[in-house]
Amino acid sequence: PSGMSFNTWMCPADTGDGEAMSLRAGAELANIEFLRMTVVPRSFNAAGLNALSGMGAVLINAKGEAFMDRYHPLGMKGPRYKMVQGVLNEMREGRGPVYMDCRGIAPEAQKHLIATLSCDKDSFKDYFEQLGIDLTTTPMEVDTSEGMQGGPNEVCGSGVKINKDCGTNVPGLYAGGNGADQCRSLHMAVTSGIHAGRMAAHYCASL
């Protein structure tokens, strides 16, 4: 990894304070041992390469070799963690730096890609312009993110252990969103936040 503590796609303020406070209050935590990593543009602390790889970009090492077939039978279509493994291994074995190469993407697809780069990452296009990177002619250097809070699968996260009412083993303490062990992803964060708030209000009204 880069050694930069905030080299993740998570908000820099997301430092686990909620889980820590809950633990000190006596709440149980679950799945904390799971971490996740991803491949990120060098010095741009946000994920954003799925669009590139999904349209045909490939990871290459400093020798210009496309290497993902060495790490998974599906190559670039393999699981994200295999991409991380591949990038780390290439760098550790002296074949870095590693690049995302978009030169093989069809011209029309390249235009679409560049036009939509900033849809969910406002400064992504600025990043390329300021570094003078033309994705149609120049491979982009990538790195691996730091380890982030993860979970055993894409649905189940890690954090404060909750029940169906978003309650914990501490009476009156409720949790939702990324701080809870069952609420990974945006829709789960929204619905669990609403439900946890309602259940907390019911608890207060019963006192």
Set out the residue ranges of the language-model regions:
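An anion/pyrophosphate-binding glycine-rich loop and adjacent beta-alpha core
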Residues: 27-142, 199, 203-205
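Hydrophobic alpha-helical segments, especially N-terminal targeting/anchoring helices
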Residues: 60, 162-163, 189
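Short, small/polar residue-rich loop motifs at catalytic or cofactor-binding pockets
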Residues: 52-54, 154-156, 182-183
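Generic recognition of stable, solvent-exposed alpha-helical segments in well-folded globular domains
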Residues: 14-17, 119-126, 155, 168, ...
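FAD/FMN-dependent oxidoreductases across multiple families
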Residues: 127-169
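Glycine-rich loop(s) and the adjacent beta-strand/alpha-helix scaffold that form part
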Residues: 1-46, 190-199
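Short FAD-binding loop at a beta-strand-to-alpha-helix junction that anchors the flavin cofactor
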Residues: 1-3, 165-185, 192
